Curated annotation (Swiss-Prot):
GO annotation (BP), single: cytoplasmic translation
Organism per entry: Staphylococcus saprophyticus subsp. saprophyticus (strain ATCC 15305 / DSM 20229 / NCIMB 8711 / NCTC 7292 / S-41)
UniProtKB keywords: Ribonucleoprotein, Ribosomal protein, RNA-binding, rRNA-binding
Protein name: Large ribosomal subunit protein uL6
Quaternary organization: Part of the 50S ribosomal subunit.
A Gene Ontology cellular-component term: cytosolic large ribosomal subunit
SUPFAM superfamilies assigned: Ribosomal protein L6 (SSF56053)
Upper lineage: Bacteria, Bacillati, Bacillota, Bacilli, Bacillales
Family: Belongs to the universal ribosomal protein uL6 family.
Any one GO molecular function term: structural constituent of ribosome
């Protein structure tokens, strides 16, 4: 049995979960998320718990079981507390600024890079070198943070670029002269 899939999901008191067929809707203080799950899984819901049940022990069902449970748990945590990723800009003259809801990055190109905020995503800029991406969908926050990082990934020689907070960048030694 899947170790993740067999865990029962606790539903906090200020969050409501509704299951209609294979669509799960989660409402909480921060907002609402809805997702269509695998149709083979079934759900047992009590007042404060939700259990994901797989129909058989086939390999296909086992692979989806834990994933489905983790996705539902992430939705519950997102509408209750939200998700946040922080990125750091390292380099001379690298800076970020807000323009309305959008993010403008000056990271060594001849032009500023503009990143638009999707629905449910907010950007925050602190000290011009720290960018915070926040939202209720873990997938969406991670994808946008990854897009921001891919504008100028950290390079191994000087360490310049955009990196996640706390990310270790492996440094290389430069060429040795004659």
């Amino acid at each position: 049995m899947s170790r993740v899939g067999k865990k029962i999901i606790d539903i906090p008191s200020d969050v409501t979960v509704s299951v209609e067929g294979n669509t799960i809707t989660v409402k909480g203080p921060k907002g609402e998320l809805s997702r269509t799950m695998n149709e083979r899984m079934t759900y047992k819901q009590d007042e404060s718990t939700l259990e994901v049940v797989r129909p058989t022990d086939s390999k296909d069902d086992r692979t989806v079981h834990g994933t489905t449970r983790a996705l539902i748990n992430n939705m519950i945590q997102g509408v209750k507390e939200g998700y946040q990723k922080t990125l750091e800009l390292v380099g001379v003259g690298y800076r970020a600024q807000m323009q309305g809801n959008d993010l403008i990055l000056n990271v060594g190109y001849s032009h500023p890079v503009e990143i638009k905020a999707d629905d449910g995503i907010t950007f925050g800029v602190e000290k011009n070198t720290t960018v915070t991406v926040a939202g209720i969908s873990k997938e969406q926050v991670g994808a946008i943070a990854s897009n921001i990082r891919s504008v100028r990934p950290p390079e191994p020689y000087k360490g310049k670029g955009i990196r996640y907070q706390g990310e270790y960048v492996r440094r290389k030694e430069g060429k040795t002269g004659k």
